């Protein structure tokens, strides 16, 4: 990490740390040392599956040890990066309010207790001299409580649907999310070849919505759900979409940008390679 951070810094790239600190803690909460901090009892003994790994393993926020542990791992990771930003993640805390924190969630509301824990983490990052970021999926379900979060917290609003609308983003912006990023995706998860048409639609729409609501920027994403079976090189086309659309409001038609990528990135004089790959990825 230190070497990569130095390399990026030399190229003017801000390498921003991103660390699960609330949900998606499969490896941590399956250990003998920390299994007792899992929201759902017995999760550590469940047979392995990619679904279980992704859908469960959220911290029990009613146990004071959970906050101490989260701060500890944030502190250790933070020291490896020179960036002034830190993404604490806190996405997909599916189990929150369903196990150890059920009574607390029934008393206050699941989203409210979520904001309380995220606030603790965000304030810790701020006190450490960094600007905190987090994913939007939980708070976007009940944006009316967004005011409970710290003002300097940057909201990373993700939505990967090809027909994504601006509704959730607008609700967040109108509910007090002053610092927003739009976060589309390159559509490579759970398949061998990325879905390029869907990536074009998703990224171009999110870029347009971000411009309309004066977002801070665009964060293009590539995920490895269920083992990341696709080769990373297949994501290059989606990455180029993100690079092109995030700075230029005059978005090129899909056929034209695919032609340009085919010629400039892959040396295909016919300009058809990306279109052929898109046809290939949609074959049964």
Describe the residue ranges of each PLM region:
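Aromatic- and acidic-residue-enriched carbohydrate-binding clefts of CAZyme catalytic domains
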Residues: 1-14, 25-68, 92-116
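Substrate-binding groove of N-acetylhexosamine-processing glycoside hydrolases
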Residues: 3-6, 12, 64-79, 83-85, ...
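Short, small-residue-rich loop/turn micro-motifs
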Residues: 19, 41, 90-92, 184
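Short, ordered loop/turn segments at secondary-structure junctions
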Residues: 20-21, 223
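Secreted glycan hydrolases and related glycan-binding modules that recognize and/or cleave
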Residues: 22, 31, 264-266
């Amino acid at each position: 990490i230190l070497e990569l951070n130095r390399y990026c810094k030399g190229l003017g790239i801000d390498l921003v740390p991103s660390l699960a600190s609330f949900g998606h803690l499969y490896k941590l909460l399956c250990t003998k040392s920390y299994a007792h901090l899992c929201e759902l009892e017995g999760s550590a003994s469940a047979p392995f599956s990619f679904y279980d790994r992704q859908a469960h393993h959220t911290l029990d926020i009613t146990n004071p040890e959970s906050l101490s542990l989260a701060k500890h791992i944030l502190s250790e990771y933070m020291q490896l990066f020179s960036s002034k930003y830190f993404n604490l993640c806190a996405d997909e805390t599916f189990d929150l309010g369903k196990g150890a924190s059920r009574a607390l969630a029934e008393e206050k509301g699941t989203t409210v207790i979520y904001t309380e824990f995220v606030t603790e983490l965000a304030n810790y990052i701020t006190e450490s001299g960094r600007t905190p970021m987090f994913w939007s999926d939980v708070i976007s379900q009940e944006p009316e409580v967004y005011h409970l979060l710290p003002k300097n917290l940057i909201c990373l609003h993700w939505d990967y649907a090809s027909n994504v609308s601006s509704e959730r983003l607008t609700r967040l912006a109108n509910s007090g999310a002053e610092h927003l990023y739009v976060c589309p995706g390159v559509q490579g998860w759970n398949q061998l070849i990325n879905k390029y048409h869907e990536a074009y639609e998703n990224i171009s729409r999110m870029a347009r919505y971000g411009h309309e609501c004066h977002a801070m920027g665009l964060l293009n994403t590539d995920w490895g759900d269920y083992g990341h079976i696709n080769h990373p090189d297949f994501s290059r086309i989606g990455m180029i979409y993100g690079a092109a659309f995030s700075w230029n409001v005059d978005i090129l038609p899909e056929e034209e940008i695919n032609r340009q990528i085919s010629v400039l990135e892959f040396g295909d004089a016919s300009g058809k390679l990306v279109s052929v790959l898109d046809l290939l990825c949609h074959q049964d």
